[in-house]
Amino acid sequence: MHLFHCTDLAPDLIELPREEAHHAIAVLRLTTGQHIGLLDGKGTRAEAELIEVTKRACIARILSRTSHPPERAARIHLAVAPTKQMDRYEWFVEKAVEIGVDRITPLITERTERGKLRIDRLERVAIAAMKQSQRTWLPRIDQLTSLQAVIAEPSAAQRYFGWCEGTPPALMELYSPASDALMLIGPEGDFTPAEALLLNEYRFSAVSLGHARLRTETAALTACMWMSLAQQR
């Protein structure tokens, strides 16, 4: 069954959003009478029947709804510096949603090479990944946020940052799936020494993500995978 995203599944009759309707009509060529799945990204999944399909619009009647609790007992928040190439950051967002993440914050640091992001595009990537992986919760994606703003925000009990210098403990040695976690990943070139000192002052723990030097997006996904798997044990 094809899945579509619609933010409000309370009414019995649903008109698909424009982009979703275009996909249903022009790409999938769905017709009246076919059944579809609907996700609101907030834990509700519905089965619906298409009752009207025109050149530009799709109307569906809700047949059933199911509510799903949050997928993890503890939240995973990734704050990740944008990559120089936008497609790499989009790939990270796509895979993080598939693996399982609750919030993504594009992080501005001293060495961040990209000062602008199309958040609407990242949100579309996240929606597509949610549908592909058949998840029912869509992660929050923030606007570009400074390091100072992220670390000053009241947040998770566990606070980590990836660090390549010295011999910090591995993330998997410190992370506990019992409480929320915030993981910071710097840009290529890593955080500056001054930023690392600032993070230590705010009680962030430096962690290693392995012996190899990883790209920003690879490091972020490595951390996401470790934490997600730890919660499934």
Regions inferred by a protein language model and the residue ranges of each:
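RNA substrate-binding interface of SAM-dependent RNA methyltransferases
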Residues: 65, 69-161
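Generic structural signal for residues in well-ordered beta-strands
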Residues: 60, 138-142, 206
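Active-site/ligand-binding-proximal alpha/beta "capping" segment
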Residues: 159-198, 202-209
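Glycine- and other small-residue-rich loops at beta-strand/loop junctions that grip anionic moieties
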Residues: 81, 115, 188, 212, ...
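Structured adenosyl-cofactor binding patch, chiefly the S-adenosyl-L-methionine
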Residues: 193-233
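N-terminal positively charged helical leader segments and presequences
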Residues: 1-68, 120
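Fold-independent oxyanion-binding glycine-rich loops
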Residues: 7-8, 18-19, 41-42, 81-82, ...
